């Protein structure tokens, strides 16, 4: 009886210790109370990058004045100045590899690195000479292709469109169904492409409250987040494989 009881007690102790350890690994922002949130970045503004799709509209008091600066609903203009018809609902300007768009009447505009508001101001300054002196046009710019990708140990791996042009890593993970219990929260991989096409990677720790002050807290367009499986997932997979093998062996032996 004692021989049976001792392994059971040891197993119970191991499970208890593992549960305490796993709680520390699962909780987000564990040291948040000791961190100064005043140091966090202010309101985030996305910056335009090559291959972004921009939707731009110009409004004036007289519609005929702004008409030349607006694409029709089913048209799109490329950087070589060619106007093409599109059967889809999306319209807009594709930023070329040099960071330029070809805007009607005005011509080529360099928009790479600008925020949405800066791009609006630039376009407004360029079209003013073509408008009546009394006109005060309203220019609206939207990034219609803004998206991030979340894969790995999450509830719903997916490509997530960002309609607000602002998304934190926490929001992205939440939309992807959050991390599963087997997700490695202390070592999230973020892959980011810069304006030159070079890819960079960094590791983020969701357990650390300092993440909120990180320059990687807010995601850029086309960021990729990968959540690795933790050791428990690997161990469970190994145990599952071994168990299946032993059941197969036992089945063969008992059938003889």
Predicted regions mapped to residue ranges:
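Ser/Thr/Pro/Gly-biased, low-complexity, turn-/loop-rich segments
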Residues: 2-5, 20-256
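Bacterial Sec-type N-terminal signal peptides, specifically the leucine/valine-rich hydrophobic h-region
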Residues: 14-17
């Amino acid at each position: 009886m004692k021989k049976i009881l001792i392994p059971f007690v040891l197993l119970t102790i191991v499970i208890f210790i593992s549960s305490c350890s796993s709680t520390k690994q699962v909780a987000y922002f564990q040291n948040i109370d000791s961190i100064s949130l005043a140091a966090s970045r202010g309101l985030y503004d996305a910056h335009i990058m090559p291959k972004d799709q921009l939707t731009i509209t110009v409004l004036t008091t007289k519609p005929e004045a702004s008409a030349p600066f607006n694409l029709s609903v089913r048209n799109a203009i490329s950087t070589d100045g060619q106007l093409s018809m599109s059967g889809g609902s999306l319209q807009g300007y594709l930023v070329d590899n040099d960071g330029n768009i070809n805007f009607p009447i005005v011509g080529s505009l360099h928009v790479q690195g600008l925020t949405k508001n800066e791009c609006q101001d630039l376009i407004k300054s360029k079209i003013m000479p073509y408008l009546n002196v009394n006109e005060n046009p309203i220019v609206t710019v939207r990034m219609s292709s803004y998206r991030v990708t979340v894969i790995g140990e999450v509830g719903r791996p997916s490509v997530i469109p960002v309609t607000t042009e602002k998304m934190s890593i926490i929001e992205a993970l939440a939309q992807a169904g959050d991390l599963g219990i087997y997700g490695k929260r202390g070592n999230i991989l973020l892959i980011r492409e810069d304006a030159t096409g070079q890819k960079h990677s960094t590791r983020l720790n969701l357990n650390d409250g300092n993440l909120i002050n990180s320059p990687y807290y807010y995601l850029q367009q086309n960021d990729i987040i990968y959540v690795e499986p933790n050791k428990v997932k690997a161990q469970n997979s190994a145990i599952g494989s071994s168990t299946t093998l032993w059941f197969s062996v036992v089945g063969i032996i008992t059938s003889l």
